[in-house]
């Protein structure tokens, strides 16, 4: 009987510690300053997409020169469907566009609550360039990022 009580006590302590850790992690705030610019992807979509105008920049080559064919930026995806399990969350994904190949590469995707509390990050198993079609949602986002980069070339160059 004495061992049973000790085991129950140990399990209860582990449960309390795990609960405290989970709450502590959920309280971390997303403190970065963003300047979200919404993508116009048309009506009847379940998600809103936006890019951070504060983070967009050109990539650098290995020799340190600026590569204007690769654009690095962060993208925010928010669910519009109130009955969805994703409705109370949004994600921020690190992205790269390859203008020459009309392709996109998705990096780490971090999830937050609507109140900007960090929840978790998904890291891709491998990074790959995905060709986008101009008629798709990805293609519309691609075109708008490239147009923004061309209109703000000096800003992107200074951030590279």
Across the structure, where does each feature detected by a protein language model lie?
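Bacterial N-terminal signal peptides that target proteins for export
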Residues: 1-9
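N-terminal secretory-pathway/extracellular module detecting exported/lumenal segments
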Residues: 23-160
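Bacterial N-terminal signal peptides
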Residues: 9-19
């Amino acid at each position: 009987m004495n061992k049973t009580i000790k085991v129950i006590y140990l399990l209860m302590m582990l449960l309390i510690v795990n609960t405290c850790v989970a709450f502590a992690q959920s309280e971390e705030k997303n403190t970065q300053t963003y300047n979200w610019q919404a993508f116009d992807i048309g009506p009847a979509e379940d998600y809103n997409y936006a890019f951070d105008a504060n983070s967009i920049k050109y990539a650098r080559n290995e020799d340190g020169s600026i590569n204007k064919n690769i654009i690095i930026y962060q993208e925010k995806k928010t669910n519009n469907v109130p009955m969805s399990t994703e409705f109370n969350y949004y994600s921020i994904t690190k992205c790269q566009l390859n203008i020459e190949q009309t392709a996109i590469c998705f990096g780490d995707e971090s999830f937050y609550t609507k109140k900007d509390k960090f929840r978790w990050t998904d890291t891709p198993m491998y990074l790959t360039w995905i060709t986008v079609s101009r008629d798709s949602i990805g293609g519309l986002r691609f075109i708008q990022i490239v147009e923004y980069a061309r209109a703000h070339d000096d800003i992107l160059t200074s951030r590279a």
